[in-house]
């Protein structure tokens, strides 16, 4: 068989590897499934390795594990139209999931989707990842409550264990990892405790299930403190610095009496800080700005951003650990709460 040049793209089969190496297909199969096997000689292994390299062969993981009734692969379901690695929050979650799975000998699988809505994206991702041992379902800003409920129903149809991550508490999901900035470390409550009474809120995406809950929590805390709530002081920054910059400028122009802005991500807080500076306002002397997530943006911003550390990577590790426990039968129904931690830095002042 003619050898392929480096620039050619081709995936060889086991029979083609055997032919090129001058060995039997059985020897190739035995060796590729167990590189340490003593049933194949060292010289034969070298010829197989060279043929694999020349043919650009990649093992079909699902097919090779069918006899074991397991793939040791976990499917990640992320209903988002954004590029997977463009979001630091998602990256931290995935880092936690992947590191825990890797420690346990499992691989991570993600299939992108060209669908338009979050529920259609999830349906496609499930179809393309058939053969996984289990799933981890993320929620993103594109998800409404109805979409999340439908996504959970789709996963239930697979008869495979799954864990929900970054999703509000739901009865339909038996295995959940809940990320919470509890009232004790809520940004709004912290600002109230610092003497602020004119507090605006910058949420992520309008219509998202997280935005709805955070809106309710913010309003409830203000009302409990006998502070009037004005819905016009709630804006959406879409988790983007530029959009947050624009929204913060409009907000601070329309409501010059504001003393604090509680942003639901550090990247939005960074955009808001830049807007305040461009308007000639000092942070935190003229306007206090709070973030959320304790990301790199919070640490590198000038001034450094006071924020809520949601321990995102730990949440990802917990989700992977819980799913593997479900796969081996030791977890049937469990909810793990990851509480946030207040990180005080330089963007919030105290009002006497």
Segments (PLM) and residue ranges:
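Periplasmic-binding protein-like
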Residues: 132-140, 163, 200-202, 234, ...
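Alpha-helical recognition/docking segments in bacterial nutrient-uptake
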Residues: 1-9, 69, 73-189, 193, ...
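Short acidic capping loops at alpha-helix termini that bridge into adjacent secondary structure
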Residues: 197-198, 229-233, 283-288
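Flexible loop/turn connectors
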Residues: 249-352
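Short acidic/polar active-site loop segments enriched in Thr and Asp
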Residues: 24, 72, 133, 196-198, ...
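N-terminal helix-turn-helix DNA-binding module of bacterial transcription factors
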Residues: 1-70
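Hinge/beta->alpha junction and helix N-cap segments in small-molecule ligand-binding domains
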Residues: 80-92, 110-119, 141-143, 175-186, ...
């Amino acid at each position: 068989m003619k050898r392929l040049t480096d620039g050619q793209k081709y995936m060889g089969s086991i029979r083609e590897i055997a032919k090129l190496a001058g060995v039997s297909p059985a020897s190739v199969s035995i060796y590729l499934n167990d590189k340490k096997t003593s049933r194949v000689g060292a010289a034969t292994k070298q010829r197989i390795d060279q043929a694999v390299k020349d043919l650009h062969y990649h093992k079909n993981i699902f097919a090779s594990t069918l006899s074991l009734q397991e793939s040791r692969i976990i499917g990640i379901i992320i209903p988002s139209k954004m590029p997977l690695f463009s979001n630091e929050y998602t990256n931290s979650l995935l880092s936690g999931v992947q590191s825990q799975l890797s420690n346990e000998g499992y691989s991570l699988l993600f299939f992108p989707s060209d669908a338009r809505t979050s529920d259609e994206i999830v349906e496609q991702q499930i179809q393309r990842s058939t053969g996984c041992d289990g799933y981890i379902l993320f929620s993103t800003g594109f998800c409404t409550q109805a979409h999340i409920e439908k996504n959970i129903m789709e996963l239930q149809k697979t008869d495979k264990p799954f864990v929900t991550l970054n999703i509000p508490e739901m009865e339909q999901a038996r295995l959940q990892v809940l990320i919470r900035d509890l009232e004790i470390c809520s940004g709004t409550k912290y600002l109230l405790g610092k003497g602020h009474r004119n507090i605006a809120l910058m949420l992520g995406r309008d219509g998202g299930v997280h935005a709805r809950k955070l809106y309710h929590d913010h309003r409830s805390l203000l009302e409990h403190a006998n502070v009037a709530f004005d819905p016009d002081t709630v804006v959406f920054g879409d988790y983007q610095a530029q959009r947050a910059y624009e929204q913060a400028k409009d907000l601070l122009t329309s409501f010059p009496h504001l003393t604090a802005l509680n942003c639901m991500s550090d990247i939005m807080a960074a955009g808001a800080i830049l807007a305040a500076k461009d308007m000639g306002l000092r942070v935190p002397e003229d306007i206090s700005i709070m973030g959320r997530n304790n990301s790199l943006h919070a640490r590198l911003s000038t001034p450094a951003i006071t924020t809520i550390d949601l321990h995102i990577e730990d949440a990802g590790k917990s989700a992977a650990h819980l799913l593997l426990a479900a796969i081996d039968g030791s977890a049937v129904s469990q909810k793990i709460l990851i509480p946030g931690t207040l990180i005080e830095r330089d963007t919030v002042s105290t009002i006497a």
